[in-house]
């Protein structure tokens, strides 16, 4: 009898050992078979707790008939199926784990994707990236609880950055992105066959291996390889055809989109009976401002310049670029105004002051469909600028028989200005300008072989452009027709936003 009891006890203990769950693997940090998948949106402990309360595969005939148990029983052994959906329902619609990709977690604007671990818009993505890369510090003027939404996200940078961190944006993701870009550039350099500059490198400073790399390439990057890669890239990208293509596409594809910088507001000093005409002028300029930003984005190598430098370049150049277009379009008014033959009858200083009013050109053309009459300029108090654009620019362009290619090169030279205060990538922008110089010089030699001084004559128009643009800038502040928002902020928003449909242009 005792033997039977011992035999039964042995069998019972053996059965207990067989059915006893092995939890050692759950506690073993080195065992990956029980670790959650990285792509699963459900936290591991929550998923495990949900599996624990699910009915087992052998308990389908359970007496629990609640609706919740019936739904959970559809996938009894899955921690990432209906269990994941149940967990996701606990998050608000704009939470990174909610599965919604439509709202920015920081400001509520439309999200363009998942950036640095969080669904966000292009504006908040760019703001976070700049803050981390430049290691910027902000201060809140209120109580560090400012509202950050689509309308007010730019009011307090401190609270916006804190909300980025609170919503889960990762600083290390920005650094990893920069390191990835450096590795990709090195890979492209290696694939292109080493670090020597091509025959078209700017400034004649190709370096074959060692040495510091002279000319404009010096000081760019930390080594000759990256310098030469950038030199080859600039040389390969630049051509007059590429510049003209960017200009034409911006003119034809932007439609009625505008950058609302100029407006006749309540504090404007424009005379009441003239506000309508000035307002119409502001609308035309605002449309051209939008086109100008898109034109710059498609210009060779412009997209590779740091975003802050892009804003600085555009802010310094926009008035000059606008006046260059106006002067070019207004050449037709010289014939209409009696200044045919390249401006014959002008005074020795090139002005129209000595001419009778009937012979003076009467119109400036901002584009092919909008003109500005001289009488309007007189009433607005800008007749001096009106005459300077015609006498110092339009007349000289007509005498030189300036073609569209030469105009495009002059505008590119204005855009790539390395001498602006605050520019970080000075040598890179200088390299771009040198390449435009080379394109313009080659065009002059091929199209005007007998005119050795043409290249210099074209460049001599740039100081006049600069002088007139400064006078225009003074009038903008005098008449108080600028927006309350800084122009840099408007440029930055457009540069961070996706380009309009039809303007996508691959720039290596």
UniProtKB/Swiss-Prot annotation:
It holds the Pfam family zf-C4. It is found in: Nucleus. Residues 21-40, 55-92, 178-228 are annotated as: Disordered. A zinc finger (NR C4-type) spans 104-124, 140-164. Coiled coil: none annotated. Residues 170-223 are annotated as: Hinge. One of its GO terms (biological process) is mushroom body development. PROSITE patterns: NR_LBD, NUCLEAR_REC_DBD_1, NUCLEAR_REC_DBD_2. Residues 57-90 have a biased composition (Low complexity). InterPro entries: NHR-like_dom_sf (IPR035500), Nucl_hrmn_rcpt_lig-bd (IPR000536), Nuclear_hormone_rcpt_NR2 (IPR050274), Nuclear_hrmn_rcpt (IPR001723), Retinoid-X_rcpt/HNF4 (IPR000003), Znf_hrmn_rcpt (IPR001628), Znf_NHR/GATA (IPR013088). Residues 1-103 are annotated as: Modulating. Residues 104-169 bind DNA. Residues 24-35 have a biased composition (Polar residues). Its main location: nucleus. Keywords: DNA-binding, Metal-binding, Nucleus, Phosphoprotein, Receptor, Transcription, Transcription regulation, Zinc, Zinc-finger. Receptor for ecdysone. May be an important modulator of insect metamorphosis. Plays an important part in embryonic and post-embryonic development. Binds to ecdysone response elements (ECRES) such as in the promoter region of s15 chorion gene. Composed of three domains: a modulating N-terminal domain, a DNA-binding domain and a C-terminal ligand-binding domain. Belongs to the nuclear hormone receptor family. NR2 subfamily. This is Protein ultraspiracle. It comes from Drosophila melanogaster. The gene is usp.
């Amino acid at each position: 009898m005792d033997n039977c009891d011992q035999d039964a006890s042995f069998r019972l203990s053996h059965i207990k050992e067989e059915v006893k769950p092995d939890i050692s693997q759950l506690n073993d940090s080195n065992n990956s078979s029980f670790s959650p998948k990285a792509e699963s949106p459900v936290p591991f402990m929550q998923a495990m707790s949900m599996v624990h309360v699910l009915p087992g595969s052998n308990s389908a005939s359970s007496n629990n008939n609640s609706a919740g148990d019936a739904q959970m029983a559809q996938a009894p052994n899955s921690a990432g199926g209906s269990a994941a959906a149940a967990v996701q329902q606990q998050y608000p619609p704009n939470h990174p784990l909610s599965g919604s990709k439509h709202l920015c977690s920081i400001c509520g604007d439309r999200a363009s994707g998942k950036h640095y671990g969080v669904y966000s818009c292009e504006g908040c993505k760019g703001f976070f990236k700049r803050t981390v890369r430049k290691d910027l510090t902000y201060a809140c003027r209120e109580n560090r609880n400012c509202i950050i939404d689509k309308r007010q996200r730019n009011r307090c940078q401190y609270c916006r950055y804190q909300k980025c961190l609170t919503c889960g944006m990762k600083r290390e993701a920005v650094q990893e992105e920069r390191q990835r870009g450096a590795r990709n550039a090195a890979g492209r350099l290696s694939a292109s066959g080493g670090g020597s500059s091509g025959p078209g490198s700017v400034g004649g400073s190709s370096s074959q291996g060692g040495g510091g790399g002279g000319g404009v390439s010096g000081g760019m990057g930390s080594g000759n390889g990256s310098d030469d890669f950038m030199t080859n890239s600039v040389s390969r990208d630049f051509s007059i055809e590429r510049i003209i293509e960017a200009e034409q596409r911006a003119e034809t594809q932007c439609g009625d989109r505008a950058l609302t910088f100029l407006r006749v507001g309540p504090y404007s000093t424009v005379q009441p009976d003239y506000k309508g005409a000035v307002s119409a002028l502001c609308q035309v300029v605002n449309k051209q401002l939008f086109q100008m930003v898109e034109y710059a984005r498609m210009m060779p190598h412009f997209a590779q310049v740091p975003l802050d430098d892009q804003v600085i370049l555009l802010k310094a150049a926009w008035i000059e670029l606008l006046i260059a277009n106006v002067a070019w379009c207004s050449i037709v008014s010289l014939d209409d105004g009696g200044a045919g033959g390249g401006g014959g009858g002008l005074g020795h200083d090139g002005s129209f002051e000595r001419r009778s009013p009937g012979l003076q050109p009467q119109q400036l053309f901002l584009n092919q469909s909008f003109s500005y009459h001289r009488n309007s300029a007189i009433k607005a108090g800008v007749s001096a600028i009106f005459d300077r654009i015609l006498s110092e620019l339009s007349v000289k362009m007509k005498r030189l028989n300036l073609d569209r290619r030469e105009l495009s090169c002059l505008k590119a030279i204005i855009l790539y200005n390395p001498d602006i205060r605050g520019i970080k990538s000075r040598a890179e922008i200088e390299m771009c300008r040198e390449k435009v110089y080379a394109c313009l010089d080659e065009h002059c030699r091929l199209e005007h072989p007998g005119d050795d001084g043409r290249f210099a004559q074209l460049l001599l128009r740039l100081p006049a452009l600069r002088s007139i643009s400064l006078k225009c800038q003074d009038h903008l502040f005098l008449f108080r027709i600028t927006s309350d928002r800084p122009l840099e902020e408007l440029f930055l928003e457009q540069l961070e936003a996706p380009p309009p449909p039809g303007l996508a242009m691959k720039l290596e």
